[in-house]
From Swiss-Prot:
Domain PTS EIIC type-2: 20-352
Modification sites for Phosphocysteine: C432
GO molecular function, one term: protein-N(PI)-phosphohistidine-mannitol phosphotransferase system transmembrane transporter activity
Role, per record: The phosphoenolpyruvate-dependent sugar phosphotransferase system (sugar PTS), a major carbohydrate active transport system, catalyzes the phosphorylation of incoming sugar substrates concomitantly with their translocation across the cell membrane. The enzyme II CmtAB PTS system is involved in D-mannitol transport.
GO biological process: phosphoenolpyruvate-dependent sugar phosphotransferase system
Name of the featured protein: PTS system mannitol-specific EIICB component
Keyword Ribonucleoprotein in annotation: no
């Protein structure tokens, strides 16, 4: 019993971690286009860019200081409470941004967005039932405005000092490690600090003055390489190019060019934030680069800014080009290997679970994950299952939060397409973690199949799991995510597939839709 209890507890923790990662992805992924646009502007038009332009370079600062944090805050608030949550979240985040204008408040936005969205949701739940008829617009607007007013001041007066304190602690910690000659360990603080946009505070507040003093005495300083090495970032992005999926994979190529050649390291930060375990990759990559340069006694005479391979090549002391390249390549290699393992690690256990579940189902006489049609036993039960579908789904929805993954999948017959009644289905939703990559491709593919089958009256869309509407009719998810989709939309029909782009269940679904809607 203890073993089973521990196993269920571990699975529960795993699902919570997965849900948290999904929430981070849903905040960051929709805004990657803004990151890339800003990255191009910064890489091309700044003083050390490819084509310096003083006028256009003025766009870079406001975009990273205001636009991107506000977009992230809006996304976080909207995930919790739709447009009202997003709008007030973005409004309140201005308090943190204005209080600390020299530091891009990405982390502050990721805190304020969901927090204010949740508060807006709770405010509406309290106010709306108590609103007199005819005063709905007045109460809605003023409740949102008052909450935005309060939380903006909260961000300015409370959260901003906390963020400033965190910055100070990181800076002091890095400086102490530098003075203690534990340079590779500096990466333990530097790399995570970079990801939350504290890189300028550490680089220019600590490394530049210390490096200038060191270079004045020794002719060069390794401190100029600690934060600016492009190796750890490009290692993560190459891992996404090879092992990533959907939008993350598609955008990693452009991000890699911007990061490695343009020196705009911030472009890879969202990719790490989407998978927090990748902090380990950039830390180990950074440590490798610092250790390599320490062994080779390599350093720059002046700061390497931006941290581009081009700037590194130009700044490398005469005769030490290979030393410079070695530090970058080894840092990138270690970061890539660890990132690849992490990306695969988050996938392999799920694959193993799916295979084990399929084997278990085959042993029990039920349909396996790769079967193209039902067994005779399942066929005999199909009619009875259809009749009992509504009762089963209702009973399961009432207890969805209390059941583990396997129980939910069994209760909802997620792998038995014939077990459901599709009379009233006119909308199919594909759902994945971020609601952009794999689900979008799956929806497009099924839309074409419906068109060829004469089912053009049925709408097919895609969304993130945590944005599934409560009144969803039919939801298609990958098997490892179906339990979360059920809890989000407990009254819907749920179908599990192993692969959005290649599943025999689509043909079964089309046949059932035609039969039930004739």
């Amino acid at each position: 019993m203890d073993t089973m209890s521990n196993s269920q507890q571990n699975k529960g923790i795993g699902r919570k971690v997965q849900a948290f990662g999904s929430f981070l992805s849903s905040m960051i992924m929709p805004n990657i286009g803004a990151f890339i646009a800003w990255g191009f502007i910064a890489a091309i038009f700044i003083d050390n860019g490819w084509f310096p332009n003083k006028d256009l370079a003025q766009l870079a600062g406001p975009m990273i200081t205001y636009l991107i944090p506000l977009l992230i805050a809006f996304s976080g608030g909207r995930l919790i409470h739709d447009l009202r949550g997003g709008i007030i979240a973005a409004t309140a985040t201005m308090g943190v941004i204005v209080a600390l204008p020299d530091t891009p408040m990405l982390l502050g936005a990721m805190i304020m967005g969901p927090l204010v969205g949740w508060l807006m949701k709770k405010t509406d739940e309290f106010v709306q039932p108590r609103t007199p008829q005819g005063f709905e617009m007045l109460f809605n607007n003023f409740s949102a405005g008052i909450l935005g007013f309060i939380m903006t001041i909260f961000g300015f007066e409370v959260l901003a000092p906390i963020m400033k304190f965190i910055m100070h602690i990181l800076s002091v910690g890095v400086e102490a490690l530098v003075h203690a000659h534990l340079l590779p360990l500096v990466s333990i603080l530097v790399e995570p600090a970079k990801i939350v946009f504290l890189n300028n505070a550490i680089n220019h507040g600590v490394f530049t003055p210390l490096g200038a003093d060191q270079a004045a005495h020794a002719g060069q300083s390794i401190l100029y390489t600690i934060e600016s090495n492009p190796g750890p970032g490009i290692g993560v992005l190459i891992a996404y190019m090879i092992f990533g999926k959907g939008t993350a994979k598609a955008t990693s190529y452009g991000a890699g060019i911007i990061q490695f050649f343009g020196g705009i390291h911030e472009i890879y930060f969202p990719y790490v934030l989407m998978r927090p375990l990748l902090f380990v990759s950039v830390i180990l990559g950074g440590m490798t680069g610092v250790a390599t340069y320490s062994l080779l006694d390599f350093g720059f005479k002046t700061p390497a800014s931006p941290g581009s391979i081009i700037v590194y090549a130009i700044n490398a002391p005469k005769g030490e080009f290979l030393h410079m390249l070695t530090g970058v390549v080894l840092a990138a290699l270690v970061s890539f290997v660890v990132s690849a393992l992490i990306l695969k690690f988050t996938k392999d256990p799920k694959q193993d679970l799916a295979e084990a579940t399929a084997q278990m189902e085959a042993t029990k006489g039920k349909k396996s994950s790769v079967a193209s049609k039902l067994s005779a036993k399942d066929d005999n039960k199909a009619a009875d299952n259809k009749t009992a579908e509504t009762t089963t789904a209702t009973a399961a929805s009432n207890k969805a939060e209390d059941k583990d993954s396997d129980e939910l999948l069994d209760d909802y017959n997620t792998e038995d397409v014939d077990a459901h009644n599709y009379n009233n289905v006119d909308h199919v939703i594909f759902a994945c973690d971020a609601g952009m990559g794999s689900s979008a491709m799956g929806a497009s593919m099924l839309r074409n199949k419906f068109k060829n089958a004469g089912l053009e009256n049925i709408q097919v869309t895609n969304t993130a799991i945590n944005q599934l509407p409560k009144n969803a009719q039919l939801v298609i998810t990958q098997k490892k995510l179906t339990d979360r989709a059920i809890k989000q939309s407990p009254d819907a029909i749920h179908i599990s597939v192993e692969n959005f782009l290649n599943s025999p269940r689509y043909e079964e679904l089309i046949n059932n839709l035609k039969e039930d809607q004739d």
